[in-house]
Swiss-Prot record:
Biological role stated in the UniProt entry: Component of the multi-pass translocon (MPT) complex that mediates insertion of multi-pass membrane proteins into the lipid bilayer of membranes. The MPT complex takes over after the SEC61 complex: following membrane insertion of the first few transmembrane segments of proteins by the SEC61 complex, the MPT complex occludes the lateral gate of the SEC61 complex to promote insertion of subsequent transmembrane regions.
Positions with biased composition (Acidic residues): 41-50, 60-104
Compartment(s) of residence: Endoplasmic reticulum membrane; Rough endoplasmic reticulum membrane
UniProt protein name: PAT complex subunit CCDC47
Organism (species): Canis lupus familiaris (Dog)
Gene name in the database record: CCDC47
Entry membrane topology: Single-pass type I membrane protein
Keyword Membrane carried by entry: yes
Pfam families: CCDC47
Keywords of this entry: Chaperone, Coiled coil, Endoplasmic reticulum, Glycoprotein, Membrane, Signal, Transmembrane, Transmembrane helix
Length: 483
């Protein structure tokens, strides 16, 4: 039934194609010519179907009123396909189905698709590798902190510079009227007055003055807060501190008597007594109140002897200390000033440190850290106090009893020092003797002449015997004295 239906379809298609062919001819000669080469044309079409593109033919039918577009080359292919399909269907219908032929076919996996196509893998990109602002929050914080540090450095450095210049402009006239040289930087062999501050770093400025009677010179050090350091600025928010002005006057030896004296806040004096060599040795008592002399409760006194306190606390000095107590940290006069205590890992030093007759002043700048250039004018009276103290130290002299007491105190300190360092000095002397013996023995061993070497050994032996005899004689004398 299927075969007959397919055959009818083929006949209908073939008839429509042949009818369209005859419609294309205009005269009978063309029809005759077409009849002669009818099958030849189909042969040419089958041979050229691979290389030539097919032509489209439009046919119209009156009964169905439909327009169809057919390819000439496809007609034969469709006909052949129908015939092949008929024959294949006939073969499949005639042949029986063999179950054993497809045994195990469903069990084999289809590997052709996996061989031809690579497997698709989806990679999860970490969050920190994605291009978003959230991935750079650490870098943003670092850059922000760096910019804040740089801005604070510039602002803090400029503010310290303005404060230093404001202080110098305020005190310049007073300094130039009392000192011949103001502002020597020490770069030239000859002392020259530069008339400006010497910047040590971003928060410390120095000024050297000299050329005045009774003193070798005066070093002024402006110690400002580390405003250029952001961490220091944050720390000061928790614990406010003040800028300071430290003045060190080195007196001539003949223009200052022998005494140690200090006045200042109780907290500052306790700290200085622990740190400074002279205050710890000559002022061993606790700081005493200055209410007896009319000083405020915030100030205390350390003195080697009462005579020094009576002589230094005159009316003008008390006036300075009373009216500017909030700006005074400490005032320290000493003929035995050697700086802070020397701390050595191997013990006490073998000799007393060098001392200088010195006046030390430490003043607090108003503002408790929030200082402005106009606040520097409030420190000008304190510089007048320094000038007055220089003249006062030159005029003040101890009486005979005070002088003897001061000398005893210095002898006592020296004796205590020698006792503390006696063992160390003995060890140092023993090491020097051993080093000398070692050098002598090496000199004898390096001698090439045997006779000369023998004489050197005999001389060394005689020296040792003489030293031993002297030591025995001293021991006998000590025993005789003891009897």
């Amino acid at each position: 039934m299927k075969a007959s239906l397919a055959f009818c379809v083929v006949l209908l298609v073939f008839g429509s194609v042949s009818e369209a062919k005859f419609d294309d001819f205009e005269d009978e000669e063309d029809i005759v010519e077409y009849d002669d080469n009818d099958f030849a044309e189909f042969e040419d079409v089958t041979e050229d179907s691979v290389t030539e593109s097919p032509q489209r033919v439009i046919t119209t039918e009156d009964d169905e009123d439909e327009t169809t577009v057919e390819l000439e080359g496809q007609d034969e292919n469709q006909e052949g396909d129908f015939e092949d399909a008929d024959t294949q269907e006939g073969d499949t219908e005639s042949e029986p189905y063999d179950d054993e032929e497809f045994e195990g076919y469903e069990d084999k996996p289809d590997t052709s698709s996996s061989k031809n196509k690579d497997p698709i893998t989806i990679v999860d990109v970490p969050a920190h590798l994605q291009n978003s602002w959230e991935s750079y929050y650490l870098e943003i914080l670092m850059v922000t902190g760096l910019l804040a540090y740089i801005m604070n450095y510039i602002i803090g450095k400029n503010k310290n510079s303005r404060l230093a210049q404001a202080w110098f402009n305020t005190h310049r006239e007073l300094l130039e009227s009392n000192f011949t040289l103001v502002g020597d930087d020490g770069t030239n062999k000859e002392a020259t007055s530069t008339g400006k501050l010497n910047q040590e770093n971003e928060h410390i400025y120095n000024l050297w003055c000299s050329g005045r009677v009774c003193c070798e010179g005066m070093l002024i050090q402006l110690r400002f807060l580390k405003r250029q350091d952001l961490l220091n600025v944050l720390a000061r928010m928790m614990r406010p501190v003040s800028d300071q002005v430290q003045i060190k006057v080195t007196m001539n030896d003949e223009d200052m008597d022998t005494y140690v004296f200090a006045v200042g806040t109780r907290k500052a004096l306790v700290r200085l007594q622990k740190e400074m060599q002279d205050l710890s040795e000559f002022c061993s008592d606790k700081p005493k109140s200055g209410a007896k002399y009319g000083l405020p409760d915030s100030l205390a006194i350390l003195s080697e002897m009462g005579e020094v306190t009576e002589g230094m606390m005159d009316t003008k000095m008390v006036h300075f200390l009373t009216h500017y107590a909030d700006k005074i940290e400490s005032v320290h006069f000493s003929d035995q000033f050697s700086g802070p205590k020397i701390m050595q890992e191997e013990g006490q030093p073998l000799k007393l440190p060098d001392t200088k007759r010195t006046l030390l002043f430490t003043f607090n700048v108003p503002g408790s850290g929030n200082t402005y250039p106009k606040d520097m004018e409030a420190l000008l009276p304190l510089m007048n106090m320094v000038i007055y103290s220089i003249d006062k130290a030159k005029k003040f002299r101890l009486n005979r009893e005070g002088k003897q007491k001061a000398d005893k105190n210095r002898a006592r300190v020296e004796e205590n020092f020698l006792k503390l360092t006696h063992v160390q000095r003995q060890e140092a002397a023993q090491s020097r003797r051993e080093e000398k013996k070692r050098a002598e023995k090496e000199r004898i061993m390096n001698e090439e002449d045997p006779e000369k070497q023998r004489r050197l050994e005999e001389a060394a032996l005689r020296r040792e015997q003489k030293k031993l005899e002297k030591k025995q004689m001293k021991m006998k004398q000590i025993k005789v004295k003891a009897m």
